[in-house]
Amino acid sequence: EAHIYGTLHYGQEWPNNDSSGQAYSLPDGSNPADDFHTYAIEWQEGEIRWYMDDYLYATQRRSEVRYNSNGEATGLSHRGWYTEYFEQGTGELVTHWDNAPYDQEFYMILNLAVGGSWPEAVNETGIDPEAFTNGQSFEIDYVRVYECGSDPETGAGCETIRPGYDSL
């Protein structure tokens, strides 16, 4: 598999949760598992960005919601994080744009997802048994967490978005 994925999981508990993300392949087509790489996530109010070897490959932003004079939500950006599910009690389709917990404390999970429906969804052949032979392992050299300041005028943090980048 020559892809990595930056994915947000948010909303209610399964099965009413949601996720969104972006795949990235190395420019030369090589397998990311063949060597160590530097992965980074920048998280600031209303936006999360993913990098591999200093290359920005994905951005997710909070949905923007406007309200009409009747107080009804309009203008929901379906490019941001939001959830839609059928309410069990009423059977109505419910849309929530306020279920993204990225303005609250949470913890980080570093994992190698190989089970469930994920392999078949992203790789037509499913799990490759050869990936688990000859002593293969999932190795992490180090994890660092930094807090970057924000520009008091713009509110932007970290300031590392590359010029010409178009977010999701």
Where are the model-predicted features located?
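GH16 jelly-roll
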Residues: E1-L168
